[in-house]
Amino acid sequence: MPRFTKTKGTLAATALGLALAGAAFADPVEDGLVIETDSGPVEIVTKTAPPAFLADTFDTIYSGWHFRDDSTRDLERDDFDNPAMVFVDRGLDKWNAAMGVNGESCASCHQGPESMAGLRAVMPRVDEHTGKLMIMEDYVNACVTERMGLEKWGVTSDNMKDMLSLISLQSRGMAVNVKIDGPAAPYWEHGKEIYYTRYGQLEMSCANCHEDNAGNMIRADHLSQGQINGFPTYRLKDSGMVTAQHRFVGCVRDTRAETFKAGSDDFKALELYVASRGNGLSVEGVSVRH
């Protein structure tokens, strides 16, 4: 991927830099999130102490929920109002559907979706059998292809988004706890390198927005810390679900760079690194964002 291109891109980067330099700062909204569900209220940790490797960067890490307006935050307080729950229901239909060539369903092996509780909180992770870094999409596709005999689902396809929404919901309220040591360490380091590398004509890195300018207002948007504990999320701008891999493509493309592909080894490593920056926050299951 090209890091940057000079000429017009440099001028655009300068203009954006000036905009950021003059941007107004707004503290994250001081609020607490308790979600009303059919099973009762679920308290969500949306701010906490940073992981050790970020201790010199942030005093507190915040879920992106704190950087949204009142109406958007309120949509997440009750499952009845949360538009993402439609996609959870679609995922449940797929879970129980006899999709396999021999009539297998997800439930045939895993029983109810609650068997997935805790998975979202530790993803991505290095698979103990293959030694490869796996995102949740990889595990879903392993079942789809190897156990059901179907064609692989696209990483950002509707089928995948529906299933990820259902699976993620089972870990709602659990603390994000991805491993970054041992076999995960080289992948984590690669993801960190991507996070701090400037890309595109705008010569911007992930850190430029979500670390250097977190809390600033630009183009009526309140820049967050870029946490992904709420993904997959219902994005009001897109009127649909967005996964972390999907969002990475959009972010890099916004720098006017030729982006890595969703589900690529590079974006898997980036997802591991970004997820680790939110260790200690709660999985929000399916959140709502602008």
UniProtKB/Swiss-Prot annotation:
Subunit note: Heterodimer of SoxA and SoxX.
Modifications after synthesis and translation: Cysteine persulfide at Cys-251.
Binding residues annotated for heme c 1, in chain numbering: C106, C109, H110, C143
Residue span, Cytochrome c domain: 78-171
Protein name (record): L-cysteine S-thiosulfotransferase subunit SoxA
Function: C-type diheme cytochrome, which is part of the SoxAX cytochrome complex involved in sulfur oxidation. The SoxAX complex catalyzes the formation of a heterodisulfide bond between the conserved cysteine residue on a sulfur carrier SoxYZ complex subunit SoxY and thiosulfate or other inorganic sulfur substrates. This leads to the liberation of two electrons, which may be transferred from the SoxAX complex to another cytochrome c that then channels them into the respiratory electron transport chain. Some electrons may be used for reductive CO(2) fixation.
One Pfam assignment: SoxA-TsdA_cyt-c
Keyword Ribonucleoprotein: no
Keyword field: Electron transport, Heme, Iron, Metal-binding, Periplasm, Signal, Transferase, Transport, Zinc
Protein family according to the UniProt entry: Belongs to the SoxA family.
Binding site for heme c 2: C206, C209, H210, C251
Annotated residues for binding of Zn(2+) 2: H190, D266
Gene assigned in the entry: soxA
GO CC annotations, alphabetized: cytochrome complex; periplasmic space
UniProt subcellular location: Periplasm
Leader sequence residues: 1-26
Active-site residues from the entry: C251 (cysteine persulfide intermediate)
Residues binding substrate, per UniProt: R247
InterPro entries: Cyt_c-like_dom, Cyt_c-like_dom_sf, SoxA
Cofactor note: Binds 2 heme c groups covalently per subunit.
SUPFAM superfamilies reported in the protein's UniProt record: Cytochrome c (SSF46626)
